[in-house]
């Protein structure tokens, strides 16, 4: 019985930390900036992102229908994911070619954080959790 309690404690301690540490652990600078903007919920922070597509994607997620628009995104998968999430249309997620982006899209549109665990890319998995923690 005592051994089971230690295993339970170890399992609890290994659970993902809160969203703040999620962003800090992201390697790619633009993805980290996007994560921080999403975490703070401030579309103004999206302006710090160097990548044109990620800047627009970030802004569209935080302020749909305002300054940024998913249709201005050049990358096809990013544009499709943006449209699906902003419109909460799970069927649009199926049109995304990248498996991880498709999984992230489904998790966010379904508001099912447990689905983030199925994403292979660690940075995308972290961003998925941050989006769903807002």
Where are these regions (language model features)?
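Bacterial N-terminal signal peptides
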Residues: 4-14
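Non-catalytic tandem-repeat scaffold regions and their flanking low-complexity/translocation tails
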Residues: 19-134
């Amino acid at each position: 019985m005592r051994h089971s309690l230690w295993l339970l404690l170890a399992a609890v301690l290994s659970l993902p930390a809160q969203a703040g540490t999620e962003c800090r652990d992201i390697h790619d600078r633009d993805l980290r900036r996007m994560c921080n903007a999403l975490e703070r919920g401030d579309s103004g922070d999206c302006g710090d992102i160097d990548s044109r597509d990620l800047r627009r994607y970030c802004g569209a997620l935080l302020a749909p229908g305002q300054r940024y628009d998913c249709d201005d995104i050049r990358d096809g998968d990013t544009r499709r994911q943006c449209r699906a999430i902003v419109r909460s249309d799970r069927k649009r997620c199926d049109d995304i070619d990248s498996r991880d982006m498709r999984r992230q899209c489904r998790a966010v549109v379904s508001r099912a954080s447990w689905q983030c665990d199925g994403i292979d890319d660690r940075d995308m998995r972290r961003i998925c959790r941050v989006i769903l923690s807002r």
